[in-house]
UniProtKB/Swiss-Prot annotation:
UniProt record similarity statement: Belongs to the ATPase alpha/beta chains family.
Entry GO MF terms: ADP binding; ATP binding; proton-transporting ATP synthase activity, rotational mechanism
Identification of the protein by name: ATP synthase subunit alpha 2
E.C. number: 7.1.2.2
Keyword Zinc-finger listed: no
Length: 504
């Protein structure tokens, strides 16, 4: 049998051409400690920070601490079946979540797995949960408004697309309601919403999902939930999963609103993991990198420049305060990262002012440039008027003999507070907000009894819908006030039909 060199060389060439390289990582370690959502493993000398690791029972973990002799791992799932001495294997991958249109209308966990019982999610796209935030030259300044439908926010602390606006307040002051109402108001705004519930009760998340479904908002919303019963690693990862899903839409030129409800619970989960992993505690026992925990998350919210499609992520992070103390560690951290804050005060909430927004401590650092011209015109002096009223109100308690000008200011202030009240799940379109604020500023409400102000607003909106829809349409399309004479005439005409009720 003769061997021909040409045949051998052609066979070798063929095999080289058909060769497919596959990265196979076969490092195997041994679990030396397991408990409370974390594990330690020996023998994974080449593991990378943030790498996914697989335990022998199929549960995944993520390498967090790379030490001399072992690796600290956070476990992404039930850890009760893992035993000391079990094998743990490197995968060579980093943590990714599914992304894309198929997620809209679904409720998923921190790993992107469906938890709503509606079957698997048909999507092939994935994104890593950790990503570099857009750089300076990839962004543009905030210039488009995000209409929340809440008068007190759109007038006093306007939010723009691509902004990060902190919502801060004690528990039970209506923080979640503000976010849900904002999501409901995005129905016709070409906006995708992602609601990330961190450490909430299952029943609370269920109520939020049902509210969104009832109002048709699930058609453009993804809910990411890491409930209070879940292990701490899933609470820690939930916000990153939410923003990874949002980035897919942003880089495709779409606008996304992400609500993180709330980051205090994420910080507490991260503190728990860090202490279990024996990292040195700092102030309030939080680890030294708790600022970076939130800054790297919130910096991923941006308004991209036009060459990248002009998409945006607007972030509404929540932080819970204790007894209104906004100078605690986590609140001050997040205030310094965000572009403004909306402070909800329990005193106002319990006195019936809802949403309970404290106009003095709330601020929007970049939203003003995104506010529409009509709203800027009517709401220009509103914040100062409100601050002056609060000051006068405290003085007026001490003396009854007030001069006419002071009395007039107090009366106007009462009506301003009343106008800014709003019912739950009833967001208001911006043109109707402009209308009632115009009526307030131009003294149409001065002789309307305070208890009738909200009825006046409701009847005025209905009357304008039927008799002067063209004025509302003009505000909506031009974003400017219509001809003043026409608007004044219409308001006077309505005012003549309004019948004040008897004093209560």
């Amino acid at each position: 049998m003769s061997i021909k060199a040409e045949e051998i060389s052609s066979i070798i060439k063929q095999q080289i051409e058909n060769y497919q390289s596959e990265l196979k990582v076969s490092d195997v370690g041994t679990v030396t400690y397991i408990g409370d959502g974390i594990a330690r493993a020996h023998g994974l000398d080449n593991a990378m920070a943030g790498e996914l690791l697989e335990f022998s029972n199929g549960v995944m973990g993520m390498a967090q601490n790379l030490e001399t002799n072992d690796v600290g791992i956070i476990i992404l799932g039930p850890y009760t079946e893992i035993r000391e001495g079990d094998e743990v294997r490197r995968t060579g991958k980093i943590m990714e979540v599914p992304v894309g249109e198929a997620l809209i209308g679904r409720v998923v966990n921190s790993l992107g797995q469906p938890v709503d019982g509606l079957g698997p999610i048909e999507t092939t796209g994935t994104r890593p949960i950790e990503a570099v935030a857009p750089g300076v030259m990839q962004r543009q300044s905030v210039n488009e408004p995000l209409q929340t439908g809440i008068k007190a926010i759109d007038a006093l602390v306007p939010i723009g697309r691509g902004q990060r606006e902190l919502i801060i307040g004690d528990r039970q002051t209506g923080k979640t309601s503000v976010a849900i109402d904002t999501i409901l108001n995005q129905a016709d705004q070409d906006m995708i919403c992602i609601y990330v519930a961190i450490g909430q009760k299952e029943s609370t998340v269920r109520n939020a999902v049902e509210t969104l479904r009832h109002h048709g908002a699930l058609d453009y919303t993804i809910v990411v939930t890491a409930a209070a019963s879940q292990p701490a690693p899933l609470l820690y990862l939930a916000p990153y999963a939410g923003v990874a899903m949002a980035e897919e839409f942003m880089y495709n030129g779409k606008h996304v609103l992400v609500v993180y409800d709330d980051l205090s619970k994420q910080a507490a989960a991260y503190r728990e993991l860090s202490l279990l992993l024996r990292r040195p505690p700092g102030r309030e026992a939080y680890p030294g990198d708790v600022f970076y925990l939130h800054s790297r998350l919130l910096e991923r919210a941006a308004k991209l420049n036009d060459s990248l499609g002009g998409g945006s992520i607007t972030a509404l992070p929540f932080v819970e305060t204790q007894a209104g103390d906004i100078s605690a560690y986590i609140p001050t951290n997040v205030i310094s990262i965000t572009d403004g804050q909306i402070f909800l005060q329990s005193d106002l909430f319990f006195s019936g002012v809802r949403p309970a927004i404290n106009a003095g401590l709330s601020v929007s650092r970049v939203g003003g440039s995104a506010q529409i011209k009509a709203m800027k015109t009517v709401a220009g002096t509103l914040r100062l008027d409100l601050a002056a009223y609060r000051e006068l109100e405290s003085f007026s308690q001490f003396g009854s003999d007030l001069d006419a000008a002071t009395r007039a200011k107090l009366e106007r202030g009462k009506r301003t507070v009343e106008v800014l009240k709003q019912d739950l799940h009833k967001p208001l379109k911006v043109e109707k907000q402009v209308l009632i604020l115009y009526a307030l500023v131009h003294k149409y409400l001065d002789d309307v009894p305070v208890h009738d102000v909200l009825r006046f607003e409701s009847e005025m909106n209905t009357w304008f819908d039927h008799n002067h829809p063209e004025l509302l349409e003009e505000i909506r399309t031009t974003k400017k006030l219509p001809d003043e004479a026409k608007l004044e005439a219409a308001l006077k005409e309505f005012k003549n039909t309004f019948v004040p009720s008897e004093e209560k």
